[in-house]
Amino acid sequence: MFNEITKSVTWNGQVLELSTGKIARQADGAVTVKMGNSVLLCTAVVANKAKEGIGLLPLTINYREMAYAAGKIPGGFFKHEGKASDREVLVSRLIDRPIRPLFHPAFVNETHVTCSVLSYDPETPVDILAIIGASAALSLSPAPYLEIVAASKVGLINGEFVLNPTLALLKTSQLDLVVAGTSGSVMMVESEAHLLSEEQMLEAVKFGFESFQPVIKIIKELAEEAKKPKLEMQALYPASLKKEIEKLFVKEIEQAFAIKSKQERSTNLDLIPEKVLTHFVSDIENKKYSNYQIESALKAIESDILRNEILEKNRRIDGRSTTDIRQIACEIGLLPSAHGSALFTRGETQSLVSTTFGTSLDEQIVDSLEGEYKERFMLNYIFPPYSVNEAMPMKAPSRREVGHGKLAWRAINPILPNKVQFPYSIRVVAETTESNGSSSMATVCGSSLALMYAGVPIKAPVAGIAMGLVKEGKNFAVLSDILGDEDYFGDMDFKVAGTSEGITALQMDIKISGVDFKIMKVALEQARLGRLHILEQMNKVISKPNNELSKNAPSTTTIKIDKDKIRDIIGPSGKVIKEICETSGAKIDISDDGTVSVYASDRDKLKVALDKIKAIVVEPEIGEIFNGTVVKVLDSGAFINYVGNKDGFVHISEVSGERIETVSSVLKQGDIVKVKLIGFDNKGKAKLTIKNADKDKSSNNTKPKTHVNNTKDNSEPEQRRDSSKKRAWNEDNNAEIAEVITERKYFN
């Protein structure tokens, strides 16, 4: 029934298996990828008809993580997979980027690639397996997919490169790098690094590139046996058409490109297509040429003009040389109510960034195949239509926005303080208010400025720069700080972020059949010089974090209590902690280890919450004096709430130094009285006295006194508390509330 074909290779000590012919046989290409206990199904479907006139390849990549792959049922009200998570969006983009440039330029058929994780093994990199599976599925399909791609993940642990490190190993790694490419060149790089040098990054890319070559071999072997006939492709446009357009319109195009302002240049360039189509209207009616062919030829001419200016004259469309950086302007603190803010402008690209502090309760909860975890640092990148003067409605974050935000997150995350050094959760929002290239790197620069102004003790300022490439044969030019048009018509988008000491994030996308390591080395060094220049400009405005947080930032403190006291603070069904939060206006977060974090908008609210917590967790000791509240009066005595939620009993004989007939003649419910703890009965219930309590030094915080119980009840041994026992409240953390409350200084 099945004509299954399987190819396998031992890769990094594990067997990687690719098979086709058993599952999803009606898809144009379908490959099952197995490694360890991970199983992925990758399919490719190609539409029969071309979709002309859209100006780009209609390729859609969908990566899905099925909950059952990890033996889980999806959370939420609807128990099925919903919209794509950020993780799924990011991996979908990771698959798309090395694959998209390798289709025939004239191919415009709708193409859908789906990669589903059916079984999950945390010891294997499923994102890497998805890239491999997608490449294999396309190789089997009719799509004119010109070269085969594979990928690998690289870590750096104890100075050694590690191939496809596990999730556990990545936690100790200085590098998390994904490399994808063909048998001859690198197509895509994505990484987060902890201040690595350019040389280390280049060596890591080489290591990853060499590591996936055996995988390309088995994909080729599988395709040779199982591939379907490829679609025959024609040239995108006749060469004669391009020559005719050049002859008639090249001067006008050159004049438009000579305009340095983006808006004016775009306006003039947008007028040309209509003139060209009008000139060829009879040829279009006679079906000699199509609109799409004419527009494609025109775009090719525009590309040639821009590229020739750079390669032959070392001149870019805004007049800069290949290494020049656009003019930079930095401003901080422009949003008075925000905890931190900055405006970073580089040429016609601008990012408005704000920083907000929250509590551990504000951390982002992420549900993944590995399990649920929290993200303390959040960075949201927003790209509104007005930033490029487009009249469009604002929508939910696009895949591009999610991807750019994650790149900026990777750049900033390595230099943030840990939770002990800085107990807040942090949200950064970067809104691109103008865009003409490299908006994600403007986000990195603006985020660094806003964090420093907000008082976050980051390790060092971070800047980012986007590099471009124009390559014709062996001749090439690497461009620093690229414009939007240079990105569109160029061959590479190479983004590097880091401090003056090293790289924190790297992303490379290629539009041609790949680049060699010589070009990458030049690009990395040129990016380093550009990054240092940008940092120099940023440092003129702010070079280190402010010593104090904004007055709008919440106050916070963290204390330690005995773990067995956690339930007392929480109370039945959360009643106690809810009451503390409501009456104080503070937020409280309690960890399983007894760490209690208290957050409030001001010091007074924080003190109220701390006092209430102290009253609950304090271990009362014999001889201490308390201000108590009468809660119930009986004939034999009275129950008095003397600290927190603790009640004690005052016998009628301990109510007064004089004989009384009834307790109610002296005490009434709600009365505030001074009481002394004199012991505990055999059930651990507190015994209190009012006699002579007001003559002793009265304080709810007096030092514990040794007290010998003088109760007349000798039927049971006295159950006394050891006066040397430490309180559940850690006094070192509470020397004085004013010292505990943050003074907005977090520097050692």
From Swiss-Prot:
Any Gene Ontology biological process: RNA processing
Residue span(s) of domain KH: 554-613
Positions of the UniProt region annotated as Disordered: 693-733
Family annotation (SMART domains): KH (SM00322), S1 (SM00316)
Primary location group: cytoplasm
Keywords, ordered alphabetically: Cytoplasm, Magnesium, Metal-binding, Nucleotidyltransferase, RNA-binding, Transferase
Top-rank taxon, per record: Bacteria
Subcellular location: Cytoplasm
Ranges of Polar residues composition bias in the record: 699-712
Domain S1 motif: from-to ranges: 623-691
Gene3D superfamilies per the UniProt record, alphabetical: GHMP Kinase, N-terminal domain, K Homology domain, type 1, Nucleic acid-binding proteins
Catalytic activity: RNA(n+1) + phosphate = RNA(n) + a ribonucleoside 5'-diphosphate
Obligatory cofactor(s): Mg(2+)
Binding site for Mg(2+): 487, 493
Pfam annotation, one family: KH_1
EC number: 2.7.7.8
Function as written in the Swiss-Prot or TrEMBL entry: Involved in mRNA degradation. Catalyzes the phosphorolysis of single-stranded polyribonucleotides processively in the 3'- to 5'-direction.
Sequence similarity: Belongs to the polyribonucleotide nucleotidyltransferase family.
Protein name: Polyribonucleotide nucleotidyltransferase
Organism: Rickettsia peacockii (strain Rustic)
Gene name linked to the record: pnp
